[in-house]
Amino acid sequence: MFGIASSLFELGGLIVMHDADGCNSTYDTHDEPRWYDTPSMVYVSGINEIDTIQGNDQRLIDNIAEAVEAAHPRFVAIGGSPMPNAIGTDFKAIERLVAARTGLPTLGFRTDGIHSYLPGAGGAYVWLAKTFLKAPHRKPQKPAKRVNLLGLTPLDFSVVGNATTLKQIVTDAGFTLQSSWSMGDTLDTLAEAANADVNAVLS
């Protein structure tokens, strides 16, 4: 769940953590250092006991639709926590309902809030590529010149200058930075990532 939120944080989408709030509010206050200077739309759904017992997903869908009308995001992403995972919430069905109601590209991903953030971040990146990536309009260069940085989030690299340093290493070596997935870049720039000659995967 935190992986989805971190990888999509800067890209203009509405990101929903389907949870009762509680300890997962720490994403806002502790785990996401970009909150201090970068606006985003990351929310906790506030699922309650009755909704959990009855399997009521309608309130979540209604709240997302209301937030979309108010905030005008580029897309919607919904990730799960231990409670929805335990009751078998159908995130793909919610994805389809939200997409039909809002008309926006929507990701519903069954994260569980228990394991590593890597599957969530990776799944979000795959969805981004399938949904927004445009066909390349430049021919590959030999030797390679244009570089994508993949996997750049503060969960691994913090906000103490590491992202800037990595980008500087690329440009100082004579390469052109095509896109950064996903610190310091926009959704429109990421959509042009197929024009790169090589991907550098960061870990």
For each predicted feature, which ranges?
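An N-terminal assembly and electron-transfer interface module characteristic of large anaerobic redox
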Residues: M1-S203
